[in-house]
Amino acid sequence: MKNLEIYIHIPFCVRKCEYCDFLSFPADDDAKLRYVKGLMAEMIFYGPLMKNYQVFSVYIGGGTPSSIDEQWIAALMEGVFDCFNVLPDAEISIECNPGTLSREKLLAYRDAGINRLSIGLQSANNDELKLLGRIHTFEQFVTNYEVARNVGFKNINVDLMYGLPGQSASQYMATVNKIIRLHPDHISAYSLIVEKGTPFYEKYKFDMVRQEAGMRTEFLPNEDELYDMEKAGQKAFMDAGYRQYETSNYAKRGMECRHNIGYWTRADYLGLGIGAASLISNVRYTNTSDMDEYLSRCRHIHDVGDDIFRANLHVAADVIDKKGQMEEFMFLGLRMNEGVTREAFERAFGISIDAIYKDTIDSLKKQELLVVKAGHIYLSERGKDVANYVMAQFLRD
């Protein structure tokens, strides 16, 4: 059987954060219940189409999945187990906001088969949390983290963010050190990206121009400060026994996120819910992002028969040609510290990697941006600092 991972999008949140540009919004319980029913209809439709797949990862993301009733999460998990071939040791994750967690929810998640939590802390500084528009305090996070451990969760990720307005390296490291002392199994550390259409963009757009131009900034950390934060955090994580296995992700040995690795290695994945994307047999599908349209399409989803290519939830279906597949293989694979292997490339495409990328690899190796060793090709320490440049070299005209 082929491998598959499933992503379930829960778009709801209590309040949208100042920096957030994800597909998320507040809603009442009636709207949430209608949406859950839509997700169930989608699962029932796809189940028979995915009968030749075995599910190794399920990821419930958002939005804030922990903002909806825990019994609805349990119902969704029951639907997943009923409709798909879920492996006994599958990684099953849910994203949580510390401000919407409780012992009751954590027990319900555990009993529903969820075995991994991804808790969005972002900062251990309450002033920074308030600036970000987060609805929780650091103290709430610690309380719920300890409850999660007490009820039996043995795989917990904590999300952190650096490069916040007015943040110094010492402030970021204070957060890093507090989290390390809690010994989570996995840590994700992302630099703040100020996106258009967010409240942060309106506040800091002129600072962004200065930042991109290498000029002195008023609120946002400059490039050198961001670099110092990243490297200081990286050293602290690694000194504490975490292994950096991807650009922004650190894990204790054996606790790497399988869902992330599946994405970076181009495993097939099925996205359920509004705005969700899927990749099945090198065709990328995208669901509608309009809630009313999504619910209407879910009501008539079976009208198209059993052909995934004609499922009326999709507003786009793009076939990825061989060139695009190779490019994705390289720039997604190079995000991981172990990089890509010659063997995996040849197995995927029936041709040696040197036949396609020899000149590019040799050039980047000469610039000391790539390391080629024992069949592996991966970013050097210098290459990691200019990763976007390196990955762009594998985009063929």
Q: At which residue positions do the language-model features occur?
A:
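Local cysteine-cluster metal-coordination motifs and their immediate loop/turn environment
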Residues: 11-24
